[in-house]
Amino acid sequence: MEEELPLFSGDSGKPVQATLSSLKMLDVGKWPIFSLCSEEELQLIRQACVFGSAGNEVLYTTVNDEIFVLGTNCCGCLGLGDVQSTIEPRRLDSLNGKKIACLSYGSGPHIVLATTEGEVFTWGHNAYSQLGNGTTNHGLVPCHISTNLSNKQVIEVACGSYHSLVLTSDGEVFAWGYNNSGQVGSGSTVNQPIPRRVTGCLQNKVVVTIACGQMCCMAVVDTGEVYVWGYNGNGQLGLGNSGNQPTPCRVAALQGIRVQRVACGYAHTLVLTDEGQVYAWGANSYGQLGTGNKSNQSYPTPVTVEKDRIIEIAACHSTHTSAAKTQGGHVYMWGQCRGQSVILPHLTHFSCTDDVFACFATPAVTWRLLSVEPDDHLTVAESLKREFDNPDTADLKFLVDGKYIYAHKVLLKIRCEHFRSSLEDNEDDIVEMSEFSYPVYRAFLEYLYTDSISLSPEEAVGLLDLATFYRENRLKKLCQQTIKQGICEENAIALLSAAVKYDAQDLEEFCFRFCINHLTVVTQTSGFAEMDHDLLKNFISKASRVGAFKN
C-alpha cells in the first residue's frame, strides 16, 4: 500500500501532499534542535547540518532539493536576509535550484557552501572577511564567491573559527579570512579579504583533502604527506614545537607514513593512515588525543583503538571530542563527553560517528554534512536485491557447507555465463557446492543480484579466486577494491602473491607500491621470509627498477 507523505512545494513553502511508495529517512533525531520540526518535516530531510555556539542553528535540504533553515539566526547565519530567529523551518529561496555538495561553518557563525557544480557561496558573520567577498559586513544572504575561483571547481570546503579554506578539483587550496596566526598561509598575519591560493610548499603539490582547527589548517597531498600552517600554541600542527607557522610546512614526524584523511578539533588533530592507524596531536585537556592522559602532544602520537582497522575519523573545530569507526562497524569516542574527560577510546553503542557528536559533544553539532540518498520508489535493481536468498520466490537453492542459499535460475542465467550453460538443461532445484566456502559463494550470488559485494578484505581474496574461476571481470575489480582496504604491512606480501596468482594486475600494482612505501617493515615480516622464490626474484627486480634500494 502506498503511503502519503507531505512534500514542501509551492510559493508558501508549506507542506503539500504527495504520494511515495517508500522513502529513506535521514536520522537526525539525536540532535535536540530537530525537536522543533514536525514528524512530517523530519521524514523529508535528505541532508542536514547543525551548527552554532549551542547547536542552535540548522540547515537542511529535502528530498525535492529545497533548502530550509531554522534557529537563532546569529549574524544572519541562516541566510534569510534578516537576523530574526525562527523556531519553524523557513525556506532559503536565494539558493533555489542549487544542490549542496559540501558545507562547513565557523564560530561567528559563518557558512561556506559548495554546490555540485563546484560553485562557492558564503554568508553569516564577516568581521574578519571570512566570507571572502572583500568586505567585513555580515552577509545576510548567500553570496557567490568567484574572485580567483571563477574557473575552478571546488570539491571540498573547511572553516576555522573565522577563516575559510576550499579545495579545487585540480588539487589547489584557497584560503581567506582571519589571519592573526598565519592560518591563511600567506606568509603574513594580515587578514585576507578574498580567496588567495595557498602556495609555498604546496605550489607543486596535489592536495586531496583539507581540514581546519579553530585557527590552523591541514592539507593532505596525493603522496600521503601532511602539510600544516597557522596557530600552534598547543602543538596542534605536529611540528614538535609551539611556534605559529605562517606558511605550509610538512609534518616531518610522519615521514614514511601515508595519510589518507585528516580531522581537526578545537585545538587537536587526528589523521588516518593507509593502514588504518590513527595518530593524534595537539591540545589534550579533555583527553581528546586518546593517549590515556591529559598532556598536550606536539608530535604525532599513535592512538590505540582496537586490533580492527580504522576506516573513519571524526572531529570538529568547535568541540574537544574525537571519534573513530572500525572496519567491523564499531564506533569509539574520546575527549570531552558531557562534562567528563574520556582519556582513552571508549566503545559506544552507535553505528556511526555522527551520533557521537549529537549525544556527547559540546555543543551538539554535526562534524560533517549529514546526507542520505532519496528513495522515492523501488527501482528494478532494488527489487532484485530484495529477492536475493528469498525462499518464497526462489526456484533454486545451493547447498554450501550445510547451508542453503536461495536463488532464481532465470536471473543467474541472465547475469552469469557460467550459469547460462550449467543450468541450461538442469532441472534440479538443489545444487551442491564444495569448491568454495559459504561466505564466499553467498557473496558471489548476492553480487549477481546487487552488483556489489559485502565481504571483509580477507574473505574477498577467496571471492577473487571464484571471480577468476568464473571469469567474472567486474566482480574481480570489486574484489580488488575491497582487498586494497585491508592491506597492512603484515599481509602485504600475501595479498601481492594472491594478486599475481589470480592475475589481478591492478591489485598487484597497488600491493607492490604499498610494499615499496613500507619496505623496511614489510621485508621483516614472516610473509616476506616465506615468499615464493620466483615471486621474490621478480619483486626484487621490479623494486630495483623503481629505485627502492638507492641510498
From Swiss-Prot:
Give the RCC1 repeat ranges: 64-115, 117-169, 171-222, 223-274, 276-326, 328-382
Give the residue range of the signal peptide: none
**Domain spans labelled BTB:** 394-457
* A GO cellular-component term linked to this record: cytoplasm
Q: Which domain of life is it from?
A: Eukaryota
Which InterPro entries would you find in this protein's record?
BTB/POZ_dom, RCC1/BLIP-II, Reg_chr_condens, Signaling_Regulatory_Domain, SKP1/BTB/POZ_sf
Work out whether the entry's keyword set contains Repeat.
Answer: yes
Q: Domain comment?
A: The BTB domain might play a role in targeting to acrosomal vesicles.
- What is the protein name for this chain? RCC1 and BTB domain-containing protein 2
The primary gene name is RCBTB2
